[in-house]
Amino acid sequence: MSVAIELTKYLMLLLMGAYTYHAFRVSVKKNKSIQDKSYRWMTGFLFTLHFTGYFAMYLQVQSDKLLLLYGGEVLVFVLVLTFYRIVYPGISGLLLRNMLMLLSIGFIILTRLSFDKAVRQFFITAVALGIGLAVPAFIYRFKWIRNYGWIYGIAGIALLVLVLLVGTERYGATSWLTVFKLFTIQPTEFVKLLFVFCIAALFDEGTDFKRVCAVTVMAGATVLTLVFQKDLGGALIFFVTYIFMLYTATEKPLYLFLGLSGGSMAAWVAYKLFDHVKVRVMAWQNPFGYIDNEGYQISQSLFAIGTGGWFGMGLFQGLPTTIPVVDSDFIYSAIAEEFGGLFALCLILIYINCFILLINISLKLEDNFYRLLSLGFAVMFGFQIFLSVGGVIKFIPSTGVTLPLISSGGSSIVATIIMFMVIQGIYHGGNTWMQSGRNERKHEE
């Protein structure tokens, strides 16, 4: 059995490397036949890697529940690949497959860490993907969504204030809201969507100095509310997203310089005012000096990454559960320990591939609202990955940010899937409009 488990980890690494290669090949090659061939390979690698991960776990657990969960996930993946392409033939096949690959990796590692959390994650993901099927049509058909910028902003702030007043505190931040005493949600994840819609809609109407000041006040109120919740990681994501959307909309480097300077000053003030920020900075500077207390989490994370080496320990062969909150904030450490450093690097490359794709979609758009919307989501997505991975590997202090589409957390999964579907709607709409224009020109000829 040990030989089989050892072989599965190398097979998963090869599959991950091959998938990553084809993901970038699709990005570079513009020939449709080459892209279609790579898509077929990527689909095969996706399902084979998913099977290999569950096969390795089944060899050690021997549980029928594992087979049922695996079968449910395969069914969902097949339905998504089938129905999304039928309903929206113009969507990005690359973005769709990358999303499913990230979800599959998340399912595997969460099943290894906590079967109950993996089941919960699966059902939430299935519902989110079902809801997401309607999002692209809504985005590219209803142009009036750009007319309610102030409503998006006010609704987002109101939701954050509600959490501040009656929310539940976890890990030092008041970011969770209990619904009917049945389950909790993290409204910040959904406010991210409202925030980007708000900024894109308002700057679509104009970028004069008066409007810039008004929108900045709106964005500042959102960030300050997150600061009062002590969700400084979330506040940082919102702040950086706004600064880059502001710069893109106005094309004035002065705004970018002032924003980044102000952000640096705000970070210094946060360090002076909040004790938990000081603790995280201390743990970042010298984790082994505080290994029994403040530095325990990051120390265990570094031990896990170092233990995994380049090729990993194999599923159920490491000790990732010694890391506090490993299923959410520090899940990248668990992946690096059991799948290996090379696998973890390929994972980062897939995230980078998604980020580049979102940026390219934004650059090709002529409609200012959709351009800002795509860019805002790209920055928000990319910066969240930077904060999550950077905190885990001790590149920056930990900010308590989850890894999109992989970490445990229903709110994060739902919001990220909706975000991807919004982008797909923009992409599909652009392809549909271009095709309609070609058909009209042919008809005229």
Where are these regions (language model features)?
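Re-entrant/interfacial helical elements at transmembrane boundaries that shape
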Residues: L177, F238, F316-T322, I350-Y351, ...
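A juxtamembrane structural motif centered on a specific transmembrane helix
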Residues: T52, S388-E445
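Membrane-interface alpha-helices at helix entry/exit sites of multi-pass transporters
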Residues: K32-K37, T188, R211, Y255, ...
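Long extracytoplasmic/lumenal interhelical loops at the membrane interface
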Residues: I305-L342, S362-L365, F369
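Hydrophobic alpha-helical transmembrane segments of multi-pass inner membrane proteins, especially
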Residues: Q62-N293, S333, E337-G391, I418, ...
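Transmembrane alpha-helices
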Residues: M1-P89, M101-F107, G130-I131
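Alpha-helical membrane-protein architecture signal
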Residues: V217, E294, I298, F311, ...
